[in-house]
């Protein structure tokens, strides 16, 4: 989760988040290199007292500054498309979880497990042992290293189910069902919040995901039944 004075991404807890962080590092490296070169050229032009008044055109330079940006854009394009398709493609999920947005709480359903369902409300943050505006009364429990499908929709306005450390952000739109892959690579508790302004209490509908071992997950399922 995010902490004070944290300027980078949260620690990634899924393979999709790993890919997104790597892609971000690649793009940032390219941006820094281009920005440094541009600043150097501008500074050099201002400091240089010499100028060539007879240089009106140069085909070699024009070819270079046309080809180089194309190559850079392709370097950015291919990893981006790969990550988008990896996140969007649903391949043999072990089971599905439904996430339903309401004003202003989330509901979760496990249709393959005797249709387990429950609501998840934000807890009162008067307890100092809790994270302010992030703790919920019921957590979404998932097994780690198991591919799942997250299905989300809304009953009223547009919400957005977002857990940054899992690399997930999907809109919950009324009358529409969106889906994407969900997988956690380690046990832990991951926090998120609705990321679509949805009304007065938009800031008070947190998301709390607990990733556990498969054995513990089955025990939790049995207790719910």
Curated annotation (Swiss-Prot):
It comes from the Eukaryota. Cu cation A1 binds at residues 159, 194, 198, 205. GO terms for cellular component: mitochondrial inner membrane. It is found in: Mitochondrion inner membrane. Its cofactor is Cu cation. One of its GO terms (biological process) is ATP synthesis coupled electron transport. It catalyses: 4 Fe(II)-[cytochrome c] + O2 + 8 H(+)(in) = 4 Fe(III)-[cytochrome c] + 2 H2O + 4 H(+)(out). Residues 48-62 are mitochondrial matrix. Binds a dinuclear copper A center per subunit. Its main location: mitochondrion. Residues 1-25, 83-225 are mitochondrial intermembrane. Cu cation A2 binds at residues 194, 196, 198, 202. SUPFAM superfamilies: Cupredoxins (SSF49503), Cytochrome c oxidase subunit II-like, transmembrane region (SSF81464). GO terms for molecular function: copper ion binding; cytochrome-c oxidase activity. Keywords: Copper, Electron transport, Magnesium, Membrane, Metal-binding, Mitochondrion, Mitochondrion inner membrane, Respiratory chain, Translocase, Transmembrane, Transmembrane helix, Transport. The chain crosses the membrane at residues 26-47, 63-82. Mg(2+) binds at residue 196. It is a multi-pass membrane protein. Its EC number is 7.1.1.9. PROSITE patterns: COX2 (PS00078), COX2_CUA (PS50857), COX2_TM (PS50999). It is an enzyme of class 7 (translocase). Belongs to the cytochrome c oxidase subunit 2 family. Component of the cytochrome c oxidase, the last enzyme in the mitochondrial electron transport chain which drives oxidative phosphorylation. The respiratory chain contains 3 multisubunit complexes succinate dehydrogenase (complex II, CII), ubiquinol-cytochrome c oxidoreductase (cytochrome b-c1 complex, complex III, CIII) and cytochrome c oxidase (complex IV, CIV), that cooperate to transfer electrons derived from NADH and succinate to molecular oxygen, creating an electrochemical gradient over the inner membrane that drives transmembrane transport and the ATP synthase. PANTHER family: CYTOCHROME C OXIDASE SUBUNIT 2 (PTHR22888:SF9), CYTOCHROME C OXIDASE, SUBUNIT II (PTHR22888). Component of the cytochrome c oxidase (complex IV, CIV), a multisubunit enzyme composed of a catalytic core of 3 subunits and several supernumerary subunits. The complex exists as a monomer or a dimer and forms supercomplexes (SCs) in the inner mitochondrial membrane with ubiquinol-cytochrome c oxidoreductase (cytochrome b-c1 complex, complex III, CIII). This is Cytochrome c oxidase subunit 2. It comes from Apis koschevnikovi.
């Amino acid at each position: 989760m995010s902490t004070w004075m944290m300027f980078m991404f949260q620690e990634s807890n899924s393979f999709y988040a790993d890919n997104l962080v790597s892609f971000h590092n690649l793009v940032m490296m390219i941006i820094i290199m281009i920005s440094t070169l541009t600043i150097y050229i501008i500074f050099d032009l201002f400091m240089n007292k010499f100028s060539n008044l007879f240089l009106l055109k140069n085909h070699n330079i024009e070819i270079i500054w046309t080809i180089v940006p194309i190559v850079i854009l392709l370097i950015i394009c291919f990893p981006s498309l790969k990550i988008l398709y990896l996140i969007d493609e649903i391949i043999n999920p072990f089971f599905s979880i439904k996430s339903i947005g309401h004003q202003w709480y989330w509901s979760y359903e496990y249709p393959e497990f005797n249709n387990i369902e429950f609501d998840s409300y934000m807890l009162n943050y008067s307890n100092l042992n809790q994270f302010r505006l992030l703790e919920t009364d019921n957590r979404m429990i998932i097994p780690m290293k198991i591919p799942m499908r997250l299905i989300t929709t809304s009953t009223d306005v547009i919400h957005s189910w977002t857990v940054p450390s899992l690399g997930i952000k999907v809109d919950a739109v009324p009358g529409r069902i969106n889906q994407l892959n969900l997988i956690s690579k380690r046990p832990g508790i991951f926090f998120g919040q609705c990321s679509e302004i949805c009304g007065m209490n938009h800031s008070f509908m947190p998301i709390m995901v607990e990733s556990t071992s498969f054995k513990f997950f089955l025990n939790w399922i049995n207790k719910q039944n």
